[in-house]
C-alpha cells in the first residue's frame, strides 16, 4: 500500500486522547467522576462537546473510537436494538463490510490474536427453544447515542468502536496501525457509495420522508424476527399529543 497515494483519497482527524485526566490517573472517568463515553449526546463535558464539534465540522464517512478493554479483539457494528432515529437501511451493509475490513487488518501479523469478534455478525446464536431457532444472546447494542461511536451515526457516519484486548500491549500496537490502514483502504474503495448514502439520509430529512418501510426490517426482536419492533421503535406521528 502506498500511504501517500492512499491519503489523496482519505484524510484522517486524530484525537489522541479524549480523557486526559483519566489517562493521567488510570481511570475511566474524568477528575470529576464523569464517564466521557456516556456523554456524547448530551455533551455536558467539554471533552465530548469538542469531539462532536469535529464531527459537525467534517461530516466524516467513518468515526472510530479506539479503547478497551475486553478479553478478545472486538470490532463493531453492534447488535440490535438499534437507535430508532438511525436510517439503518442506508448504513447496514457499509457497517458490516467496514467492520470486516478493520478486523482483518487488526489481526494481520498479530502474534497474540488471530481472530476478532463482531457483535452484529457473531452474537446471533442458535436456540432450538426460540420461535425462529435463533436468538440474540449477548447485548452489544447501539440503542443509545451516548456512546462516542454511536452519536455520529445520526448524520450518516459509520461509527464503530474497536475494543482492544486486555493486557496485550503487543496486540494494541498491531491493531491500531493495521486496522486504521485497512479502514482507510475501505473508505478509498467505497467513498462514492458512502457519500451517496449520506446524501440520501440528508434528503430524507430535508423532505420529511417516511422511510419506515425501508428501515423496519432492521428493527428485530430478541429472536431476530424482521420488523417485529418497528412500530414500537418508529411510530408514525398521527398528529395527536
Which sequence ranges carry the predicted segments?
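Short helix-loop-beta-strand segments that form the rim/entrance of peptidase-like active sites
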Residues: 1-32
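Metallocarboxypeptidase
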Residues: 13, 29-241
Amino acid at each position: 500500500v502506498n500511504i501517500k497515494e492512499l491519503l489523496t483519497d482519505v484524510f484522517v482527524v486524530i484525537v489522541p486522547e479524549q480523557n486526559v485526566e483519566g489517562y493521567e490517573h488510570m481511570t475511566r472517568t474524568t477528575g470529576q467522576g464523569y464517564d466521557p463515553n456516556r456523554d456524547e449526546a448530551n455533551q455536558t463535558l467539554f471533552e465530548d462537546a469538542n469531539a462532536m464539534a469535529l464531527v459537525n465540522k467534517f461530516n466524516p464517512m467513518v468515526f472510530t473510537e479506539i479503547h478497551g478493554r475486553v478479553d478478545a479483539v472486538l470490532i463493531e457494528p453492534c447488535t440490535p436494538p438499534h437507535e430508532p432515529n438511525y436510517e439503518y437501511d442506508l448504513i447496514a451493509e457499509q457497517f458490516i463490510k467496514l467492520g470486516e475490513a478493520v478486523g482483518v487488518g487488526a489481526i494481520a501479523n498479530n502474534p497474540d490474536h488471530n481472530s476478532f469478534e463482531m457483535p452484529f455478525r457473531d452474537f446471533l446464536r442458535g436456540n432450538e427453544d426460540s420461535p425462529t431457532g435463533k436468538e440474540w444472546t449477548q447485548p452489544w447494542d447501539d440503542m443509545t447515542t451516548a456512546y462516542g461511536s454511536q452519536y455520529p451515526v445520526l448524520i450518516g457516519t459509520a461509527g464503530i468502536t474497536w475494543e482492544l484486548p486486555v493486557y496485550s500491549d503487543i496486540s494494541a500496537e498491531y491493531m491500531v496501525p493495521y486496522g486504521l490502514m485497512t479502514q482507510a483502504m475501505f473508505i478509498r474503495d467505497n467513498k462514492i457509495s458512502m457519500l451517496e448514502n449520506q446524501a440520501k439520509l440528508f434528503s430524507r430529512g430535508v423532505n420529511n420522508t417516511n422511510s419506515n418501510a425501508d428501515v423496519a426490517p432492521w428493527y428485530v426482536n430478541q429472536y431476530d424476527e424482521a420488523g417485529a419492533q418497528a412500530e414500537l421503535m418508529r411510530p408514525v406521528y398521527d398528529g395527536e399529543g
